[in-house]
């Protein structure tokens, strides 16, 4: 039955493997409206047909994902390693809309907060944030078919999602880097699901990234430099010599989740792994880019100054950024969660005195889908087993019972009781006569 349901689901999804808005938001002749499989007009997604999996292999992966999502709790409880492996291979395009909300926990958040997004979307937004959001709408993927028209459902949906987040977290407000992140989510998800995915990314995967001080970005910048010094010491030395600090390139990478830095197919593969394994994927991607751009002596020699070095980080050959080739190198980077957390604690101790805002809390960052799933399951158990408030019940006083009376047996013999029970005695000689007469003289 599960297989039949999975095949029905695949048949519904395979007719749209890119975006939700592939219809007529553009005007003009059809040649000018032709978009690639990801929805970019003129094929601007940077897609290269190298090392692409075959149709049969894609079909097999789709069936595996359908089977896992149909039994998601069982899969995450017992077979998370399989989920991680499949995420590294890449989630099929037709199933990202189903898998991303499950991986990041947005599906459970939406279930636990029914009607919240509708209330936020219907409420008027803060004029301060609405003006800033309105200026940024046309900058998010202007060559994507969803976001070309100002009145199209892409820009309008993006406006509603970003406005809803400013109302959901008014103390944080809006950060410009949330725009491209929310736009990528809207390419695959309806606005409500995109909103809850954005909430999970901002509050669970990358807490402190999009606040007013962005203190977590500063912390991760120092962590990245420490990891770079350990794994690529010559590249680290070159950056120090030319004066390229991490804040010159890392915010664009990490805050936007590489949406503005890499080809779109590669970005999607990074997101698949990021939603599965957490923030350490971002560090692995950053280290891989450093090695590809400045890993050789010739590359470093060709970059004698700051501008040349920053240009080299943006001029990596597209063939090296193709998703299959690039992601295989990303996953080969040795970086465990334990090492990352250890380095975070070291750098946090050094930065806590100099940060203008509150110190970031690295323990609030959950390392991927498994930790999020376990956290939500634990929260559900606590909610279901919540103890009731004790109640004091006052019972009315009972009426006193009369004391039990003992039967009056004083002065009463057994013979007297027997006479009352059996009636008058049988006629015969008196007791004195019976005592003096013999047994044979007794009359019956």
Swiss-Prot record:
Residues carrying the site annotation Arginine finger: 135
Q: Where is this site: Glutamine finger?
A: 176
- Region feature (Disordered): 1-32, 383-444
Q: Where is this region: Interaction with calcineurin?
A: 404-444
- Gene Ontology biological-process annotations: B cell activation; calcineurin-NFAT signaling cascade; ERK1 and ERK2 cascade; negative regulation of B cell activation; negative regulation of calcineurin-NFAT signaling cascade; negative regulation of ERK1 and ERK2 cascade; retrograde transport, endosome to Golgi
Which N-terminal stretch is annotated as signal sequence?
none
Asked if Repeat is a keyword of the record, the answer is no
| InterPro entries, per the entry | Rab-GAP-TBC_dom (IPR000195), Rab-GAP_TBC_sf (IPR035969), Rab_GAP_TBC_domain (IPR050302)
Tell what the record comments on domains.
Answer: The arginine and glutamine fingers are critical for the GTPase-activating mechanism, they pull out Rab's 'switch 2' glutamine and insert in Rab's active site.
The subunit field of the Swiss-Prot or TrEMBL record says: Interacts with both calcineurin and HRAS.
- What function is annotated for this protein? Inhibits the Ras signaling pathway through its intrinsic Ras GTPase-activating protein (GAP) activity. Acts as a negative feedback inhibitor of the calcineurin signaling pathway that also mediates crosstalk between calcineurin and Ras.
Q: What is this protein called?
A: Carabin
Lineage start:
Eukaryota, Metazoa, Chordata, Craniata, Vertebrata
């Amino acid at each position: 039955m599960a297989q039949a349901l999975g095949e029905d689901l695949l048949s519904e999804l395979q007719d749209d493997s890119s975006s939700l808005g592939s219809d007529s938001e553009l005007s003009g002749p059809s040649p000018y409206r032709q978009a690639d499989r990801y929805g970019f007009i003129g094929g601007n997604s940077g897609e290269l047909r190298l090392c692409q999996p075959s149709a049969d292999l894609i079909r097999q992966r789709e069936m595996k994902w359908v089977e896992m999502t149909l039994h998601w709790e069982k899969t995450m409880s017992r077979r998370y390693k399989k989920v991680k492996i499949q995420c590294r291979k890449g989630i099929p395009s037709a199933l990202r809309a189903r898998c991303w909300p499950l991986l990041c926990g947005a599906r459970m958040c939406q279930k636990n907060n029914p009607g919240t997004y509708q209330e936020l979307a219907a409420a008027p937004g803060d004029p301060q944030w609405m003006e800033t959001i309105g200026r940024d709408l046309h900058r998010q993927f202007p060559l994507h078919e969803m976001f070309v028209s100002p009145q199209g459902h892409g820009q309008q949906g993006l406006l509603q999602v970003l406005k809803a987040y400013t109302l959901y977290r008014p103390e944080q407000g809006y950060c410009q880097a949330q725009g491209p992140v929310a736009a990528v989510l809207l390419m695959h998800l309806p606005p409500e699901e995109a909103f809850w995915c954005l909430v999970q990314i901002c509050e669970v995967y990358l807490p402190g990234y999009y606040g007013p001080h962005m203190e977590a970005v500063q912390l991760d910048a120092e962590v990245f430099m420490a990891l770079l010094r350990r794994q690529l010491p010559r590249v680290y030395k070159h950056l120090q010599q030319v004066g390229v600090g991490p804040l010159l390139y890392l915010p664009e990478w990490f805050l936007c989740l590489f949406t503005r830095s890499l080809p779109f197919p590669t970005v999607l593969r990074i997101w698949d792994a990021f939603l599965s394994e957490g923030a350490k994927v971002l560090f692995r991607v950053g280290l891989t880019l450093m090695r590809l751009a400045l890993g050789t002596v010739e590359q470093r020699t060709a970059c004698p100054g700051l501008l040349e070095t920053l240009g080299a980080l943006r001029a990596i050959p597209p063939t090296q950024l193709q998703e299959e080739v690039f992601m295989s190198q990303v996953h080969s980077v040795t970086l465990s969660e334990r090492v990352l957390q250890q380095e975070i604690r070291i750098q946090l101790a050094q930065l806590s005195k100099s940060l203008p805002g509150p110190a970031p809390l690295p323990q609030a960052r959950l390392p991927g889908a498994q930790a999020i799933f376990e956290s939500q399951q634990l929260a559900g158990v606590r909610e279901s087993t919540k103890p009731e408030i004790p109640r004091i019940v006052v019972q009315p006083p009972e009426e006193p019972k009369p004391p039990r009376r003992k039967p009056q047996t004083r002065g009463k013999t057994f013979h007297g009781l027997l006479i009352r029970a059996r009636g008058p005695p049988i006629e015969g000689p008196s007791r004195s006569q019976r005592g003096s007469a013999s047994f044979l003289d007794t009359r019956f």
